[in-house]
């Protein structure tokens, strides 16, 4: 399977950790966005939205990291532990995935990206949205070792990619004890943590 990615990208890292958990070897293809490689005709044929990560499995192409994660588990998982078939368990996992995409990671992008890529000043109102997102995550994790129940799922891997990116941005987790405890545990149990952290350090270079 071909996997178009950037090591520093949190969505790409979440897929890499999922593949590691499944024992899948991906044929990694580094895409240089600054050089416009994602806009070349050959890549646009694969993904007209020209985004990363993008997975090509035979004649099937898929993008959006959380969709890729679920696809890999459903097609290649020897068990359903990362994305259980139980409708209620799966619904909670989906909620966490959508929360990561639409609230937590979005708060990172909205606050930090203008500072990194447009040299804009920090917006305190957008920082409040980060704090709100972490308040929610802290509540979700109350009484739970993992993000969507009592075992590791794709929700944890997606959230881990995001939260670790906040760490290299020097965000202080100390006000969120449940998040801090979960994060410390995930660093030890998540497959592919080392590669994820190496990617975080790549991304950290943007902060100067």
Swiss-Prot record:
What catalytic activity is recorded?
Answer: RX + glutathione = an S-substituted glutathione + a halide anion + H(+)
Domain of life from the UniProt record: Eukaryota
- The keyword rRNA processing is annotated on this UniProt entry: no
Q: Where glutathione is bound, by residue?
A: 9, 50-52, 64-66
> GST N-terminal domain: which residues?
1-80
Q: Which GO terms describe its biological process?
A: glutathione metabolic process
Q: Which is an annotated GO molecular function term of this record?
A: glutathione transferase activity
Return the CDD domains for the record: GST_C_Delta_Epsilon, GST_N_Delta_Epsilon
Q: Where would I find the GST C-terminal domain in this sequence? A: 86-207
Q: Which UniProt keywords apply?
A: Transferase
List the EC numbers from the record: 2.5.1.18
Family of this protein:
Belongs to the GST superfamily. Theta family.
Question: Quaternary structure per UniProt?
Answer: Homodimer.
* Role: Conjugation of reduced glutathione to a wide number of exogenous and endogenous hydrophobic electrophiles.
Q: What is this protein called?
A: Glutathione S-transferase 1
């Amino acid at each position: 399977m071909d996997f178009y990615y950037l090591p520093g990208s949190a969505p790409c890292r979440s897929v890499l950790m999922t593949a590691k958990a499944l024992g899948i070897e991906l044929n990694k293809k580094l895409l240089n966005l600054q050089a416009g490689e994602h806009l070349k005709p050959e890549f646009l044929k694969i993904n007209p939205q020209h985004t990363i990560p993008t997975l090509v499995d035979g004649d099937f192409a898929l993008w959006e990291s959380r969709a890729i994660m679920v696809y890999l588990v459903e097609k290649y998982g020897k068990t359903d532990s990362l994305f259980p078939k139980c409708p209620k368990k799966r619904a909670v996992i989906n909620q966490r995935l959508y929360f990561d995409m639409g609230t937590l990671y979005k708060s990172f992008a909205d606050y930090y990206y203008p500072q990194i890529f447009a040299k804009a000043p920090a917006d305190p109102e957008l920082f409040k949205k980060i704090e709100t997102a972490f308040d929610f995550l802290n509540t979700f994790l109350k009484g739970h070792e993992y993000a969507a129940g009592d075992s590791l799922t794709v929700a944890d891997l997606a959230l881990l990619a995001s939260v670790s990116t906040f760490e290299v941005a020097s965000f202080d987790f100390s006000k969120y004890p449940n998040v801090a405890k979960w994060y410390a545990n995930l660093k030890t149990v998540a497959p592919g943590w080392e590669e994820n952290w190496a990617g975080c350090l790549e991304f950290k270079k943007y902060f100067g």
